[in-house]
Regions:
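Glycine-rich loops and low-complexity Gly/Arg-rich segments
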Residues: 56-61, 95-97, 136, 150-152
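Hydrophobic beta-strand-centered segment that forms part of the acyl-chain substrate-binding groove
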Residues: 65-69, 77-126
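Generic secondary-structure boundary signal with a strong preference for alpha-helix termini
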Residues: 39-40, 62, 78, 86, ...
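Generic structural detector for well-ordered beta-strands
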Residues: 34-38, 101, 159-161
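Catalytic strand-loop segment that frames the active site of acyl-thioester-processing enzymes
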Residues: 3-72
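HotDog/MaoC-like acyl-thioester-processing domains
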Residues: 1-30, 112-163
Length: 163
């Protein structure tokens, strides 16, 4: 029988490593990350999500419908951002609300090397404490997400419960 494997990234809520509500300050950046995207990531996400729209994997089709190239799934972008927030909170159930607007597509070009797992696009994100609700035990994170010069997720916020 296989023994369970403990992932280093996971820190159960309540550990000394989990952020505490009392330590948060409005205006503080709590997460900053660069998230790589490749064609292989898009295909894997399509398989996991069931979203097999060819704009996410077929360059010829994407261009035929007016796009510059293959684009990332919007929910892949949002999910990747929220995964970083979950890691920071050290609790997979800490996000109690989230919202965003998809403002621009994330083009994921074919790698010049021809290797599909080579990243050709990046999501740059920063999460800043926008508000603290001590009574509810939550912080509101205001999150900026861009790819190159484009803001790709707008008005993005997550409400996170902290101990």
């Amino acid at each position: 029988m296989n023994e369970p494997v403990e992932r280093e990234e996971y820190r159960p809520s309540g550990t000394d490593l989990a952020p505490k509500l009392r330590d948060q300050e409005v205006g503080r950046t709590v997460v900053s990350a660069r998230i790589p995207l490749s064609r292989a990531v898009l295909v894997a996400y399509a398989g996991a999500s069931g979203d097999h729209n060819p704009i996410h994997w077929n360059e010829r089709f994407a261009r035929a419908v007016g796009l510059d190239d293959v684009i990332a799934h919007g929910m892949l972008s949002m999910g990747s951002v929220l995964a970083r927030i979950t890691e920071w909170a050290a609790d997979p159930g800490a996000i109690v609300d989230c919202r965003t607007r998809f403002t621009a597509p994330v083009v994921v070009a074919d790698a010049a090397s021809g290797t599909p797992d080579t990243p050709t696009a990046y999501l740059d994100m920063a999460a800043v404490v926008g508000a603290i609700d001590e009574e509810a035990g939550t912080v509101r994170l205001d999150i900026s997400v861009s790819s190159g010069e484009d803001t790709v997720l707008g008005r993005t916020q997550a409400k996170v419960r902290l101990a």
